[in-house]
Curated annotation (Swiss-Prot):
The chain crosses the membrane at residues 128-148, 169-189, 193-213, 218-238, 264-284, 292-312, 343-363, 381-401, 413-433, 441-461, 478-498, 505-525. SUPFAM superfamilies: MFS general substrate transporter. This is Inorganic phosphate transporter PT2. Residues 149-168, 214-217, 285-291, 364-380, 434-440, 499-504 are cytoplasmic. The lineage of its organism: Eukaryota, Sar, Alveolata, Apicomplexa, Conoidasida.
Length: 563
């Protein structure tokens, strides 16, 4: 997966990295692509003539521009206001570089960055609460249906065609649709308007699923399924839009700054997953009325969307992110083969991660009942899931803490390895620890830690870093949609295996996709032509980064992206 820049000095080798030109100390950001040739083309306009040269394997490039004088002064194009003031004081360059239809002189006059809102850092309030809202609404479906099964009316309906599994499936089907459509709208009409639309759908879907589901058990589940589909479209759209908005609002082109902002936005994922169980515990301890409990649980999901709807209207956005021509934008999204290759590192890894993560997380009530037995009370099951999901909090924040140290690639790699090993370990000890419920719960907590420690963060970050701004939201949505496809497959697969084969085969099947994703991460995330020895040095050297006080970046010099 190519990083955001590389220099003209590396054009012949295709090696990617954020380095300076061999002819100059200046860096230039030139987003010019020729999708048909699957390469970058930089156009130079020396007076009346025109020169072009190709630069492969990169979305942006860096070239020196000479003023033609005796001193051989070079001029940065784009860049910060200070750099552009220096350009003005030296005089105009002899070559005019066209960037997205603008010459370097026009860019220098406007002082606008190629990306972002003119370098102004934006608040993380909307992305953070949007992520919280999305994960709350995805998770609350499972716990609400679990509570509904305590009532014979709904329990009998769950055994029909429109059972609880169908309601969950409709929620995730809506999410897949929302991720693709809202991600695309984020590029077409802008991140702000698309976010406003997604929040409106979340509010409507959550509210209607709470107040409109009345009647017999089957009718309630049918209405709830339709409403959760609408909510899923909105909640799914939150994923690409919140990640891209957080990254582009960094006020900086540095991938470290962007990745940290996206990771902090994603940190609301764990509270969003955990909060439905806390609300359910309070409600169930207050009243054992199933109707009251599940309706308040579902309706609460509308509140975060309502709270941030007005701040979303006030979000600032650069017009450069809005597609001017619908047809050209549509063609540009799907024409480049390099984008689809990058999906192996973003979308397919996300798919494999969600097979494991959602397969385990959303059947945790069933897993805990298989550990403790069906005699556990509703309160016990809720407490057990609060404890399990609570392990995600240190996992998530420890992952964020070492993100800069380890780098996105190796944090994802070791996250997948840790998740696979912990799942296999739990599978191997099920028979040994039979009857020792708390020992099995500890192992399940370790699995939950690795679910949130590595790949959970990086799969959310990567699409917002590696794709160019014109298609960033679209491909972030496609990557997230692939993840939700994996989630749907994981839910059905893990639940079926758990009910037929037990916990041991289920945990084995949960570990295999993580192992496959670790292999894909090695080869398709930031691929750099290193020797095998160098790659292993980077890989195992990055383990030192798991300690926040040790700088392991010197071990990863051959892997320059996302540092």
């Amino acid at each position: 997966m190519a990083p955001r820049y590389h220099s003209a000095a590396e054009a012949d080798t295709g090696v990617c990295g954020e380095t300076k030109s061999r002819d100059s100390d200046a860096l230039y950001d030139l987003p010019l692509r020729d999708p048909e040739e699957d390469q970058t083309t930089v156009a130079l306009h020396p007076g009346s003539g025109e020169e072009r040269f190709p630069v492969f394997q990169s979305e942006f490039t860096s070239v020196p521009v000479s003023d033609g004088g005796a001193n051989g002064v070079t001029y940065p194009v784009g860049g910060s206001r200070k750099e552009q003031d220096e350009i003005s004081s030296r005089g105009p360059p002899a070559y005019s570089l066209e960037i997205r239809g603008k010459t370097s002189e026009q860019l220098a006059e406007s002082g606008a960055d190629d990306e972002g809102t003119n370098g102004e850092k934006q608040s993380l309030l909307v992305p953070c609460l949007a992520v919280f809202s999305s994960n709350y609404n995805f998770t609350v479906t499972s716990i609400a249906l679990f509570l509904m099964n305590q009532d014979p009316l709904y329990k009998d309906a769950s055994d029909t065609v429109v059972g609880s599994s169908t309601v969950k499936m409709l929620s995730y089907a809506g999410a897949i649709v929302g991720m693709c459509t809202m991600g695309y709208l984020g590029d077409l009409i802008g991140r702000r308007l698309a976010m406003i639309l997604t929040l409106a759908l979340v509010f409507i879907g959550a509210l209607l699923s709470s107040i409109c589901a009345w009647g017999d058990g089957v009718t309630v589940l049918v209405i709830m399924g339709v409403c959760r589909f609408v909510l899923g479209v909105g909640s799914g759209g939150v994923y690409p839009l919140s990640a891209v908005s957080a990254a582009e609002g960094a006020g900086s082109e540095k991938s470290n700054d962007r990745s940290m902002r996206v990771s902090w936005a994603y940190s609301m994922n764990v509270p969003g997953i955990m909060f439905p169980y806390i609300v359910a515990l309070v409600l169930w301890c207050t009243t054992h009325n199933v109707d009251v409990c599940f309706r308040i649980l579902l309706g609460f999901g509308a509140l975060p969307a309502l709270l941030i709807w007005l701040p979303a209207w006030r979000m600032k956005e650069d017009r450069a992110y809005v597609a001017k021509d619908f047809a050209k934008h549509l063609a540009g999204v799907f024409v480049s083969r390099s984008y689809w290759r990058q999906l192996l590192g973003t979308g397919v890894c996300w798919l494999l991660y969600d097979v494991t993560a959602y397969g385990i997380l959303l059947v945790q009530p069933e897993i805990t009942q298989s550990i403790w037995g069906n005699s556990s009370s509703v309160t016990d099951v809720i407490w057990q899931n609060i404890i399990l999901n609570g392990m995600g909090i240190p996992g998530c924040f420890m992952g964020i803490l070492v993100l800069k140290q380890m780098g996105v690639k190796w944090l994802q790699f070791w996250g997948f390895v840790g998740l696979a090993v912990s799942a296999f370990l739990m599978a191997a000890t099920v028979e040994i620890l039979q009857g020792k419920a708390w020992a099995q719960l500890v192992l399940l907590c370790i699995v939950n830690f690795f679910i949130n420690w590595g790949a959970s963060i990086t799969t959310f970050i990567l699409p917002s870093l590696v794709f160019p701004p014109e298609v960033r939201s679209t491909y972030s949505g496609i990557s997230a949609a692939l993840g939700k496809i994996g989630a749907v497959g994981g839910i059905y697969t893990m639940k079926a295996i758990l009910s037929t084969g037990g916990l041991t085969p289920m945990m084995i099947c949960a570990g295999v996709p993580s192992l496959a994703a670790a292999i894909l991460t090695w080869f398709y995330v930031d691929p750099v032509p290193n020797t095998l020895r160098s790659s292993f040095l980077q890989c195992f050297g990055s383990l030192a980064g798991s300690c926040p006080f040790i700088d392991c970046r010197k071990f990863r010099r051959g892997s320059r992206a996302f540092e």
